[in-house]
Design a protein with these regions (language model features):
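Jelly-roll (double-stranded beta-helix
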Residues: 1-233
Length: 233
């Protein structure tokens, strides 16, 4: 089953210092029918304005992946980490037994990123942090694993049966991706237009995949997109 959701049907939150789309129930948005997709709990598409950000706040028992699309954010947390996350960087934070952190845009330009929350395979993990950098040219014509609990080389690790990919396809490029009938996946289009098993998905749109052995991803104009592959339960 493939469910397509248009860009206009995302929940939009404008807090002056932050403009964001919540793809699932989060913060000021709640829909009992849109809380999660399998082990995927959150996918937020966020812009933080210059010299703004998130103050110190806690998390626990969640794998949190940040994909920096443009700009930069400064991350500090209770493990002692203080790092700048630049465009092209991917970060995995294991909240585990409990972590506090802050994220602020200390630059003079807006920061645009995706934040993805996935339920971990086990409870009680020690909090940890991992960061990796990816060059945009590497996404052309292939699905590149950014974060993975399956041991993909070059990806940040996750304590979850999940993988997050990014790809940039030129017009007409097509690839088959094996999902598995016992898994779920979400395809989110960052720019361009594509089809998922023939269903059109525009910029800002998404396709939610359940109980499908495989999907065919085809770009029509050039397309930049991510795939989040998770256990269904």
């Amino acid at each position: 089953m493939i469910t397509c959701i248009s860009a206009s049907n995302r929940h939009f939150s404008d807090q002056r210092w932050q403009q964001a789309y919540w793809l699932f129930s989060f913060s000021d948005y709640y829909d009992s029918g849109n809380v999660r997709l399998g082990k995927l709990r959150i996918l937020n598409d966020v812009v933080v304005q210059p010299h703004e950000g998130f103050g110190v706040h806690p998390h626990e028992e969640m794998e949190i992946v940040t994909i920096m699309l443009s700009g930069q954010m400064t991350h500090t947390d209770s493990t002692g980490a203080r790092v700048v996350i630049h465009s092209g960087d991917v970060v995995r934070m294991t909240a585990g037994t409990g972590i506090t952190h802050s994220e602020r845009n200390l630059s003079g330009e807006p920061a645009h990123f995706l934040q993805i929350w996935i339920f971990p395979d086990q409870q009680g993990l020690l909090p940890s942090y991992q960061q990796a950098s990816f060059a945009p040219i590497g996404f052309v014509g292939k699905l590149v694993p950014l974060a993975s609990g399956r041991g993909h080389a070059g990806a940040v690790g996750m304590h979850a049966d999940a993988a997050i990919y990014r790809a940039c396809f030129q017009s007409g490029f097509k690839v088959d991706y094996a999902v598995g009938a016992d898994r779920s996946a979400l395809v989110y289009v960052l720019s361009g237009l594509m089809t998922v098993n023939g269903f059109a998905v525009e910029q800002g749109g998404q396709a939610r995949v359940q109980k499908e052995e495989s999907i065919t991803l085809t770009s029509t104009p050039d397309t930049d997109f991510i795939v989040v592959d998770v256990a269904a339960r």
